[in-house]
From Swiss-Prot:
Pathway: Cofactor biosynthesis; (R)-pantothenate biosynthesis; (R)-pantoate from 3-methyl-2-oxobutanoate: step 1/2. Mg(2+) binds at D42, D81, E112. It comes from Thermus thermophilus (strain ATCC 27634 / DSM 579 / HB8). GO terms for molecular function: 3-methyl-2-oxobutanoate hydroxymethyltransferase activity; magnesium ion binding. Its main location: cytoplasm. 3-methyl-2-oxobutanoate binds at D42, S43, D81, K110. This is 3-methyl-2-oxobutanoate hydroxymethyltransferase.
Length: 261
């Protein structure tokens, strides 16, 4: 049975599993594996669409992939990212969230930022939109943070991240993602918040963990961040299978009699 926002609000201290999925087959596999929540992240821009960052991702693209993921995982709690600038104002955020929830089938939306987006989060929550916050490394504005690197090493950075997480909780977010922050900071934030935290590159002390589907199964062999653990080398296995297929076609081995009518 699909979890509800209330379940996640009461999930503090539980070891929850989030996983990204961007289409029907990956969402179907994630649901079959029993994950607690699926995130249709705007990381699909880089992972699936080949963009250099998440910035080019449009609301229409998010909607397209959210619909597909929902069809693949009808019984799993589904969170969809609000893409870059879709929440520059509350009106824009409400319109984007409405489409992702009503048309896309999402159960909640995620947006990046701390204190600077707290009013937007509050407005969304007041309108009945469940919101997952996101602090630390925020990929949509990574260029302003010096690139894709660890955040919160310096005391002032750590203080900004903590204040941001607290502001999101106060605004009504049902949980907060902590990305690429030191484990000790993630532990402190997790202990200070009453809502659950979701870590990615944030150590073992968060309430939940999230990883990108393609990283978990090793679809891209040349990309392995330090915080990722690969459970399969799917990219290599798929490439080997495709090479064998091509070889057998060229050698006249496939199709054989058993593949013919």
């Amino acid at each position: 049975m699909r979890r509800t926002v209330k379940d996640f609000r009461n999930a503090k201290g539980q070891r929850l599993v989030y996983l990204t999925a961007y289409d029907y087959p990956t969402a179907r596999l994630a649901e079959a594996a029993g994950v607690d929540a699926i995130l249709v992240g705007d990381s699909l821009g880089m992972v699936v669409l080949g963009y250099p960052s998440t910035v080019p991702v449009t609301l229409e693209e998010m909607l397209h992939h959210t619909k597909a993921a929902r069809r693949g995982a009808p019984e799993t709690f589904l969170v969809a990212d609000l893409p870059y600038l879709a929440y520059a104002t509350l009106d824009r955020a409400l319109l984007a969230a409405e489409r992702l929830l009503k048309e896309g089938g999402a159960d909640a939306v995620k947006l990046e930022g701390g204190e600077e987006v707290a009013e937007i989060v509050q407005g969304l929550v007041r309108a009945g939109v469940p919101v997952l916050g996101h602090v630390g490394l925020t990929p949509q504005t990574a260029s302003q943070l010096g690139g894709y690197k660890l955040q919160g090493r310096r005391p002032e950075e750590a203080e900004r991240i903590l204040k941001g997480a607290l502001a999101l909780e106060e605004a009504g977010a049902y949980g907060v993602v902590l990305e690429m922050v030191p484990a000790r900071l993630a532990k402190e934030v997790t202990e200070r918040l009453s809502v659950h935290t979701v870590g990615i590159g944030a150590g073992p002390h968060t309430d939940a963990q999230v990883l990108v589907f393609h990283d978990v199964v090793g679809l891209y062999g040349d990309f392995k961040p330090r915080f990722v653990k690969r459970y399969l080398e799917a990219g290599r296995l798929i490439q080997e299978a495709l090479s064998r297929y091509a070889q057998e076609v060229r050698e006249g081995v496939f199709p054989g009699e058993e593949h013919s009518f």
